[in-house]
Amino acid sequence: KTKVWFPEGIWYDIYTGMRYDGGRMLEVYRDLSSIPVFSKAGGILVCADADELDARSVIKNPDVLCVRVFPEADGEFELYEDDNESCGYVDGRCVTTAMKYSADKDMFVISPADGDTSLIPDNRTYKLVFERRTEAAADKVKVSVDGKEVWAKNKYDKENRKLIVTVNASTESEISVAISKDTVALDNQIEKRCFDFLNQAEIGFVLKDEIYGLITSGKKTTVILSELKAKELDTELYGVLTEILTA
């Protein structure tokens, strides 16, 4: 576990998808396969697509970009690229690509590349991952390239509640993706997260049933926490459940 200070606003764990209210300190718990890394609402995370990486591709600017977009607030990001070899960037030999998300319009826009476009591919495939979405989002996607609506492949990841939209376009084109803000999944699936945690916890089955029954009882969170406290649970067990219930 570790203590995390969340500034004001809404935050998302980029690995678990958990949503946290800010303006407070909170103890967070992770297993050995994960670390707590958070994006603020409206965050735009850009990286090379993991499926496309090999020894040769890592030294050039990628043909495929994975862009993760977190909802509930406006966000901006500017992707900077150079030749990855020389000091040409000192003289301004680089290219930037601006990206912007509008929460009110629920629209994400990639602007045309600006600068020395010879440094990047003429065309790119963008895997746009819209985080925390309901299944209805897949039917509400509208993709435009240079103002003209186009067809784009989209896939809904039900387990992780993500909408993945794949667009191939010129790096000198403007791409816009509009969805609908009523497809943002605000809940933390508390019962599911608690079940998954308890399912792997090394405690007795009777105690698991008692804890899960309490969590699904419909009682107020403060009442649930007080009753869990009264059970004198292991400190770490109580801590994990507290994080999930109060995030």
Task: Locate each region found by the language model.
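Secondary-structure transition/turn motif
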Residues: 111-118, 166-172, 182
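Catalytic core of carbohydrate-active enzymes
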Residues: 1-138, 147
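Mature N-terminal, pre-catalytic/accessory segment of carbohydrate-active enzymes
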Residues: 170-174, 180-247
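A surface/secretory-pathway sequence property marking extracellular, secreted
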Residues: 141-153
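Sequence-structural signature of mature extracellular/luminal beta-sheet repeat domains
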Residues: 130, 148-150, 224, 237
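Short, charged, solvent-exposed linker or helix-capping segments at domain edges/interfaces
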Residues: 49, 141, 189-190
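Hydrophobic transmembrane alpha-helix bundles
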Residues: 1-6, 168-171, 180
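A surface-exposed beta-strand-loop module
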Residues: 153-176
